[in-house]
């Protein structure tokens, strides 16, 4: 079981690394107007809105492994397209949309939940959260460095390489056994469930703030304050230290100590504070304001992210793929809206 879980954690890690590694630099390196760059960031999310829940449903029907393989292949195709045409904003948008069509995040989470016993799930969900946290930290530090030396296309080639590695690992994993559950809940009833809606709406706003932040920070620091693009990694590295620590706290207290609700409320409050500080930073043209806002943002995101997936996976067994698909679809809906909002709000400061 452990080999299965760690293989899946790597696949999830690679998926999130591929997502995070693009965010810090796309707004600084992509050529185009602010709204086009926002759309390039958000196209991935728009596609996920459409395909996340159907992929989750598909995995409930044909099995997690087959659904994962299909999603990895689609994501790899989109990555190659982005790598080849990274200088064309419209083809970049198309490639990002194809990347998002390989919506396997929920499938991988459901796969892990299927093979881990109920009494051990909190421990492995904490490890999954730690894997996401490590992807987040590594992406924030490495992305600006790689882009400054090799260009934006190199990051997409890296995403394609991670797809190949993930596919090889997937070949060695066994399909989880199907268990007959006594649940009679329909998909429609599941979506109407109060807890499902609360978690999904929370994920929408969390990812909206995430993408708005990453579109904004590139436009503000580079476009307005004259910060060197090659030095962006320094900002992200410092922020990631705080975020990584917060992710560990969330993984331990959220599942192991049953403090998920308290941690999530704390993340919401810190989110609001970080946005307030960051939104006023262009008016003061003070990089310290932007940095403090970024640190608070990383802490808030890292506290909230591990909790959402873990809590949703506990709500249902028979339709776990659908539930996590709905959660991810709402999250990527927020990502798409946040990308456009961030570009729209900060565009006047970089014109």
Outline where the language-model segments fall.
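Conserved MFS/SLC helix-loop-helix module at the cytosolic interface between two early adjacent transmembrane helices
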Residues: 50-86
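Central cavity-lining transmembrane alpha-helices of secondary-active solute carriers
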Residues: 42-55, 237-249
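Short amphipathic helix-loop junctions that connect adjacent transmembrane helices
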Residues: 24-35, 215-231
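Juxtamembrane intracellular "pre-TM" segments in multi-pass secondary transporters
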Residues: 175-202
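Helix-to-loop junctions at the C-terminal end of transmembrane segments
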Residues: 52-63, 246-259, 346
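Cytoplasmic helix-loop-helix junction between adjacent transmembrane helices
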Residues: 95-131
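C-terminal transmembrane helical hairpin of 12-TM major facilitator-type secondary transporters
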Residues: 261-308
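Cytoplasmic membrane-interface "Motif A"-like loop-to-helix N-cap segments
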Residues: 61-71, 256-268
């Amino acid at each position: 079981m452990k080999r299965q879980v760690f293989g899946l954690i790597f696949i999830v890690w690679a998926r999130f690394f591929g997502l995070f590694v693009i965010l810090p630099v796309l707004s600084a390196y992509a050529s185009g107007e602010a709204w086009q760059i926002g759309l390039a960031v958000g196209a991935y999310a728009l596609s996920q809105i459409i395909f996340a829940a159907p992929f989750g449903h598909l995995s409930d029907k044909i099995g997690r492994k087959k659904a994962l393989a299909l999603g990895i292949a689609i994501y790899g195709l989109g990555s190659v397209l982005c790598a080849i045409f990274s200088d064309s904003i419209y083809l970049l948008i198309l490639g990002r949309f194809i990347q998002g069509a390989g919506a396997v995040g929920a499938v991988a989470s459901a796969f892990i939940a299927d093979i881990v016993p109920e009494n051990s799930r909190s421990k492995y969900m904490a490890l999954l959260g730690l894997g996401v946290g490590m992807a987040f930290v590594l992406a924030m530090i490495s992305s600006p460095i790689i882009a400054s030396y090799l260009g934006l296309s190199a990051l997409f080639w890296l995403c394609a390489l991670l797809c190949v590695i993930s596919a090889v690992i997937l070949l060695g994993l066994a399909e989880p056994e199907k268990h007959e559950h006594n649940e009679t809940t329909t998909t429609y009833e599941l979506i109407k469930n109060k807890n499902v809606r609360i978690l999904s709406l929370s994920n929408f706003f969390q990812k909206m703030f995430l993408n708005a932040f990453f579109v904004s920070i590139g436009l503000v620091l580079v476009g307005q304050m004259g910060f060197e693009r090659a030095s962006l990694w320094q900002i992200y590295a410092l922020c990631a230290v705080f975020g990584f620590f917060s992710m560990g706290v969330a993984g331990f207290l959220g599942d192991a100590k049953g403090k998920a609700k308290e941690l999530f409320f704390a993340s919401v409050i810190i989110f609001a504070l970080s946005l307030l500080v960051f939104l006023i930073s262009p008016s003061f043209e003070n990089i310290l304001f932007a940095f403090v806002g970024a640190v608070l943002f990383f802490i808030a995101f890292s506290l909230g992210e591990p909790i959402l997936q873990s809590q949703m996976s506990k709500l249902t067994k028979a339709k776990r793929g659908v539930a996590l698909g709905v959660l991810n679809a709402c999250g990527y809906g927020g990502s798409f809206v946040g990308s456009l909002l961030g570009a729209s709000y900060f565009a006047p400061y970089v014109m």
